[in-house]
């Protein structure tokens, strides 16, 4: 076979850059606080390493943050060991996106089933967007300028939900 032409190589470089930029746009929208805490160089390096290392099996772009997070969790060593809270915090940010983008139409859900007219035979239904998680780091307070230095003595558990008016 003939070696790829310079023109084909240039096209591949442009295509790779377009796909990488698209990949990064999904990461940037899912992990905005992580991105603001890490240096631009750290975030860029993490994004590039993940882009090169991930072998995604889903064609859906909306799955990119989940696939990225799974990849990061499977790394044999913490990717950025100077941020021991990073994985938990990124999971928390991702969980917020999962809840926000859940397909449930909350305004159409009756939260008492099956017989609303008989309160003694009714029971509450959980919000379908409900996600539960426990973390050792105070992920709910983490932000630029407020970085924890040690894990909490006990895990904090969260119920993340979307309300009807969200």
Regions found by a protein language model. Name each.
Residues 1-13:
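Charged, compositionally biased N-terminal leader segments and the immediate start
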Residues 12-19, 31-32, 52-56, 166:
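A ubiquitous short alpha-helical element
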Residues 23-52:
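Amphipathic alpha-helical packing elements
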Residues 11, 19, 23, 30, ...:
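Alpha-helical structural motif
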Residues 52-166:
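Hydrophobic packing positions characteristic
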């Amino acid at each position: 076979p003939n070696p790829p032409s310079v023109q084909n190589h240039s096209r591949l470089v442009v295509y790779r850059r377009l796909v990488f930029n698209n990949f990064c746009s999904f990461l940037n929208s899912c992990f905005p606080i992580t991105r603001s805490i890490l240096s631009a160089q750290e975030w860029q390096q993490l994004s590039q390493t993940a882009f090169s290392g991930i072998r995604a099996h889903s064609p859906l772009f909306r799955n990119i943050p989940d696939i990225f997070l799974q990849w990061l969790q499977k790394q044999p060593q913490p990717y950025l060991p100077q941020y021991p809270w990073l994985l938990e915090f990124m999971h928390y940010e991702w969980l917020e996106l999962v809840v926000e983008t859940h397909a449930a139409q909350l305004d159409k859900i009756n939260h008492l089933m099956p017989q609303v007219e008989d309160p003694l035979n009714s029971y509450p239904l959980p919000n379908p967007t409900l996600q539960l998680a426990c973390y050792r780091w105070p992920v709910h307070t983490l932000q630029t300028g407020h970085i924890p230095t040690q894990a909490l003595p006990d895990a904090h558990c969260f119920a993340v939900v979307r309300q009807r008016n969200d």
